[in-house]
Amino acid sequence: MLRLSSAVNTGDENMTNRIVIAGALGTVGRAALEHFDALEGWEVIALSRRPPDFDNGATWISVDLRDAADAKDKLGALKGVTHLAYATVYEMPDVAKGWLTREHADVNLAMLQNLVGPLVDASPDLRHITLLQGTKAYGGHLGPFKIPAKESDPRYMPPNFYYDQMDWLADERDRRGAGWTWTILRPQIVCGVAIGSPMNVVAGIGAFAAISREYGMPLRFPGGDPRIGEATDARLIARAMEWAGTDARAADEVFNIANGDVYQWEAIWPRIAKLFDMELGPRHPMSLARTMPGNADLWPKIVEKHGLLSYSLADLVPSWGFVDFIFGHGQRPNPHNMSTIKARKAGFHDCVDTEEMFVELLQEMQERRYIPR
């Protein structure tokens, strides 16, 4: 078990900012860790249930935020924390169905409470909390919503842990009379480099391509009819977290965050085929949730053949059902586009080319030996 060092307990006077990143091995958390770890004047404290498999300068704490006693024991000595980036989420085995349950909402609210309570007790001078949401705030998991979605749009039918968390966070600050501010970021289809994340389509693309190639098949798109999508690079979210935590214009505000363009899988799929040196085949709709688990025994052979890190297929892609959802399998086209004008007006102007993003992230997963070249 990774232990909290005395330097973190007492605080390092040479550091201007001390940030806790919850979910530091998730898609967003990992990008945030690497971003803040590279900044001058920031000390990073990373929270996760498992140790990292990459070099970094953070102090790691192994903690299960679902366990209130464990969280209090591990986090109650975190003095001098100035920022919290909350990038963790509890997902049920059937990810999409879980979104509609009260259990999903209750567990995610409790996790936030189990962290913020002892953290604020130990670090009363906390300045800022960044909380992540997404298009479920606009009912995207329920069906089509008004386009473009704006931060001022009314809420949709609960249960929804986004609403529970943001209400509790505001009430808790008022109850304590605390001085910290908060910012809520709402990204769209978050893409990054991560292992064990149930909502990371990049890993799903890489594994699907590698397995298809191993069988000698062309790369066929398995999703639904053509549709216009919108995505957010996790590295972009990390930069937005820095902005949100240091710019007064972001205080106590909600912002949609996206790459700034749109995409269609039909345009991206040829780029992926080229990256894996595969022939591009015609679209072949099929459920990856039904077909890919049956290929789990092939993955160790791919790992050995290409010298990859020894993760299982389930480690790499915990939820093929989520990949089906993002690919639009069995769905009619259902655009989920958001307006990012509010963030731009408030000073966050960063953007990313989505096609280039997918190629870069897949290449990084290859370089880190998660998927084959």
Q: What are the language-model segments listed below?
A:
Residues 4-14:
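Short, Lys/Arg-enriched N-terminal segments with co-localized hydrophobic residues
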Residues 17-39:
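N-terminal Rossmann NAD(P)H-binding glycine-rich loop of SDR-like oxidoreductase domains
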Residues 46-51:
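N-terminal Rossmann-fold cofactor-binding loop
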Residues 52-110, 114:
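NAD(P)H-binding glycine-rich loop region in Rossmannoid oxidoreductase-like domains
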Residues 84-86, 96-161:
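Conserved Rossmann-fold NAD(P)-dependent oxidoreductase catalytic core, especially the SDR/UDP-sugar
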Residues 102-109, 147-148, 155-170, 198-202, ...:
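Short-chain dehydrogenase/reductase
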Residues 171, 176-239:
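NAD(P)-dependent short-chain dehydrogenase/reductase
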Residues 237-331, 336-341, 345, 362, ...:
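Mid/C-terminal beta-alpha module of Rossmann-like enzyme folds, strongest
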